C-alpha cells in the first residue's frame, strides 16, 4: 500500500519561515558586532604577519601601538611616493602599515607590493587622526603620536625611505609578465643595425603641466634645448646608446626630438590611465633622462644608473618652492641641467 504523504500545513510553514528569518538576523547581527572595531586579538594577529611588525621593538615587547595608513591620491608616481613613505614611517615609528583599497588597485597590478589592505568598510569605523606630511623628511616624523594615524599630503622624497632602498626596490619589483614584456621590446631594438648595449629611458612630462607650470607655479616644462643637451651628454659618455622615449605628449616629442642619428625610439603609448607599459620600459633601461614629475623620479630611482633631470625650472619667487625642495626630490648623485626660464621673463 502506498504511503500517504502528510500535507505541509500553512501554520507550520509560517513557523519555519519565522525561525529561518530570526536565525539569519541574529547571525548577521553577530557578524556586525564582530566587525564594529578592530579588537586587540585581531590586530595582534595582523601584526604577526605585517612586513613592518617583525622588525620593530613594539612587537618584541608585545605592545600594541595602533596603525598607520595614508591617503591614496594622484597618479602612479604619487601613489608610489605615498606607499614608500608609509612603509618607511611605519617602520620608523614601530607601527603597522595598511594601505587603502584604491592604492592597492593602483599598484598591485604592476608591482609585488606586500603591505596589507585596509578595506573601506573597516577604515570608516576607525577614529583616524589626520597627520599632514610635507614633501621632505623632518625630525618630528620620527616620533608621530596617535594610535590610528592617517597621513595626508603628497610625499615623494627619497629623504623618507632611501635608508630602506633595498626593501623599497623589492616592494616595487615588477610582476614577471610586466617586466618580460618590457625586456622583449628592448631586446628587439637596433641602432643603425646593431643591438645596443646601453639603454637610456627618456620620460617627457607634458599634459596638464604645460599650462599649470607657467600659470600656477611660475615654472616651465622641458623644452627642445634641454632634451638635446641631455641626449648629447649620454652620447658622449656611452658608445651607441639607444634612447627609449615615453611621454604623455608623444606628438610634441616626435616634433622636437632629433632622430637623425637613428638612436631614438618612440616607445610609450602615452596613456596616463594605464601607465604600466611606459613605466616598465623606463625601469628596465640602464639610465634615465627625466624632465619633471614623480613618474620620472620613480622611474629613475628604480632603474638606477645615471640620471639627468631638469633643474631650476621655476622662478625664485615661485610658490611651488614652498611645497617642493629640489634637494629632497633628486638624489645627490643625479645630474641637473638648468631650465631655460626666458619664456617666463617675457610676461
Curated annotation (Swiss-Prot):
Pfam families: Glyco_transf_11 (PF01531). In mouse, there are three genes (Fut1, Fut2 and Sec1) which encode galactoside 2-L-fucosyltransferase. Expressed in stomach, colon, ovary and uterus, specifically in luminal uterine epithelium. Expressed in various tissues including heart, liver, kidney, testis, epididymis, small intestine,and cecum. Expressed in duodenum, jejunum and ileum. Residues 1-5 are cytoplasmic. Keywords: Glycoprotein, Glycosyltransferase, Golgi apparatus, Lipid metabolism, Membrane, Signal-anchor, Transferase, Transmembrane, Transmembrane helix. The chain crosses the membrane at residues 6-26. One of its GO terms (cellular component) is Golgi apparatus. Residues 27-347 are lumenal. It is a single-pass type II membrane protein. It catalyses: a beta-D-galactosyl-(1->3)-N-acetyl-beta-D-glucosaminyl derivative + GDP-beta-L-fucose = an alpha-L-Fuc-(1->2)-beta-D-Gal-(1->3)-beta-D-GlcNAc derivative + GDP + H(+); a beta-D-galactosyl-(1->4)-N-acetyl-beta-D-glucosaminyl derivative + GDP-beta-L-fucose = an alpha-L-Fuc-(1->2)-beta-D-Gal-(1->4)-beta-D-GlcNAc derivative + GDP + H(+); a neolactoside nLc4Cer + GDP-beta-L-fucose = a neolactoside IV(2)-alpha-Fuc-nLc4Cer + GDP + H(+); a neolactoside nLc4Cer(d18:1(4E)) + GDP-beta-L-fucose = a neolactoside IV(2)-alpha-Fuc-nLc4Cer(d18:1(4E)) + GDP + H(+). Disruption phenotype: Homozygous knockout mice for FUT2 are fertiles and develop normally and exhibit no gross phenotypic abnormalities. The gene is Fut2. It is found in: Golgi apparatus, Golgi stack membrane. InterPro entries: Glyco_trans_11. This is Galactoside alpha-(1,2)-fucosyltransferase 2. GO terms for molecular function: alpha-(1,2)-fucosyltransferase activity; fucosyltransferase activity; galactoside 2-alpha-L-fucosyltransferase activity. It comes from the Eukaryota. Catalyzes the transfer of L-fucose, from a guanosine diphosphate-beta-L-fucose, to the terminal galactose on both O- and N-linked glycans chains of cell surface glycoproteins and glycolipids and the resulting epitope regulates several processes such as cell-cell interaction including host-microbe interaction, cell surface expression and cell proliferation. Preferentially fucosylates gangliosides GA1 and GM1 in the antrum, cecum and colon and in the female reproductive organs. Its main location: Golgi. Pathway: Protein modification; protein glycosylation. Its EC number is 2.4.1.69, 2.4.1.344. One of its GO terms (biological process) is fucosylation. Induction: Induced after microbes administration in the intestinal epithelia, particularly in the duodenal and jejunal epithelia. Down-regulated by androgen in the caput epididymis. Belongs to the glycosyltransferase 11 family. Glycans are attached at residues 192, 258, 286, 312.
Amino acid at each position: 500500500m502506498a504511503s500517504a504523504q502528510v500535507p505541509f500545513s500553512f501554520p507550520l510553514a509560517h513557523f519555519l519561515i519565522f525561525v529561518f528569518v530570526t536565525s539569519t538576523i541574529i547571525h548577521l547581527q553577530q557578524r556586525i558586532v564582530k566587525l564594529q572595531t578592530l579588537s586587540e586579538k585581531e590586530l595582534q594577529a595582523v601584526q604577526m604577519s605585517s612586513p613592518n611588525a617583525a622588525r620593530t621593538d613594539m612587537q618584541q615587547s608585545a605592545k600594541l601601538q595602533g596603525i598607520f595608513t595614508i591617503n591614496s591620491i594622484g597618479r602612479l608616481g604619487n601613489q608610489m611616493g605615498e606607499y614608500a613613505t608609509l612603509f618607511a614611517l611605519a617602520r620608523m615609528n614601530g607601527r603597522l602599515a595598511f594601505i587603502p583599497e584604491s592604492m592597492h588597485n593602483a599598484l598591485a597590478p604592476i608591482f609585488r607590493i606586500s603591505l596589507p589592505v585596509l578595506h573601506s568598510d573597516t577604515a570608516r569605523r576607525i577614529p583616524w587622526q589626520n597627520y599632514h606630511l610635507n614633501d621632505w623628511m623632518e625630525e618630528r616624523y620620527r616620533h608621530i603620536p596617535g594610535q590610528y594615524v592617517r597621513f595626508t599630503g603628497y610625499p615623494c622624497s627619497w629623504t623618507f625611505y632611501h635608508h630602506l632602498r633595498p626593501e623599497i626596490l623589492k616592494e616595487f619589483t615588477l610582476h614577471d609578465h610586466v617586466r618580460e614584456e618590457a625586456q622583449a621590446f628592448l631586446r628587439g631594438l637596433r641602432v643603425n643595425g646593431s643591438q645596443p648595449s646601453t639603454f637610456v629611458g627618456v620620460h617627457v612630462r607634458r599634459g596638464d603641466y604645460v599650462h599649470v607650470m607657467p600659470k600656477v607655479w611660475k615654472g616651465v616644462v622641458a623644452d627642445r634645448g634641454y632634451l638635446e643637451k641631455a641626449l648629447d651628454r649620454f652620447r658622449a659618455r656611452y658608445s651607441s646608446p639607444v634612447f627609449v622615449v615615453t611621454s604623455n605628449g608623444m606628438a610634441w616629442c616626435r616634433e622636437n626630438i632629433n632622430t637623425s642619428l637613428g638612436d631614438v625610439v618612440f616607445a610609450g603609448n602615452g596613456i596616463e590611465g594605464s601607465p604600466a607599459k611606459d613605466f616598465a620600459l623606463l625601469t628596465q633601461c640602464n639610465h634615465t633622462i627625466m624632465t619633471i614629475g614623480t613618474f620620472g623620479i620613480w622611474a629613475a630611482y628604480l632603474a638606477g644608473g645615471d640620471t639627468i633631470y631638469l633643474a631650476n625650472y621655476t622662478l625664485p619667487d615661485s610658490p611651488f618652492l614652498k611645497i617642493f625642495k629640489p634637494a629632497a626630490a633628486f638624489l645627490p648623485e643625479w645630474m641637473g641641467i638648468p631650465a631655460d626660464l626666458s619664456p617666463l621673463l617675457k610676461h
